[in-house]
């Protein structure tokens, strides 16, 4: 049986009831923040990813819960939202909702460039600006290394022109890690985005240490391992020692592991429900696990 996060929350397994008693608006300054190495600008360590639930929005009923998520996200101190042209309606939804809520200036918008060829890349960037309803995008990263050398050249030109602020590359596939590492060594990048989870620690072998050496910001995708982690802990309660790092749910257990890595700037879990938003942002509050506790978390998950 495949358990998902909703079922775990309904069952109350490993979830402190206190997370549902948090005020709708928590102090913005309570979120843990990390600095972007290239500029010193700080970001909350938990953001929002939009790859699935924002990708097939067709009606007002689809939009309404997402609008409430973004409204409360900003009110609770969040600002990093990650999207991509390949995520269906996601860029348009994010742009429209940000405009309606008048929160664009409060957001750090990140999107991706997944075209081949210079002209196609420029066209896609122009489309992203239009969809996001913004004259400038905070971060654009070459998506899964697609035509990376060509597109990074275009992105640098746009950065110099003030149309984007940060440049990077992304992957969510282990098979690309070697090429990813080579690109990190060859190019000056503000950010990388890579897959990393408590049950998928391969990026910690070479990519994350290299990011530290290169002074590159790190955004983490797939922090729940495509849902595998929630399935792995089905029927299990949080270990008592999770309280030592202010962890109240399995989602926080998984996210606090990620953002306690000293090289990680932020993680962007997919978030389309307010209850998940409140839970996820709990990972950006309180204590984080120390190195020894991180090893203990790894042993715990590996032993399931």
Residue ranges and their predicted role:
Residues 47-52, 83-85, 111-113, 141-144, ...:
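A cross-domain feature marking catalytic cores of carbohydrate-active enzymes
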Residues 36, 48, 81, 94, ...:
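Conserved, mostly hydrophobic/aromatic
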Residues 106-108, 189-194, 287-293:
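Short hydrophobic/aromatic-enriched beta-strand-loop microsegments
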Residues 15-16, 20, 206-304:
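Structured C-terminal cap/extension of enzyme domains
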Residues 57, 116-193, 197-202, 206, ...:
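Glycine/proline-rich, positively charged
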Residues 73, 102, 159, 211-212:
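A generic structural signal for well-ordered alpha-helical segments
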Residues 1-107:
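N-terminal binding-site loop/beta-alpha segment at the start of enzyme catalytic domains
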Residues 33, 70, 91, 95, ...:
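Generic structural signal for well-ordered alpha-helices
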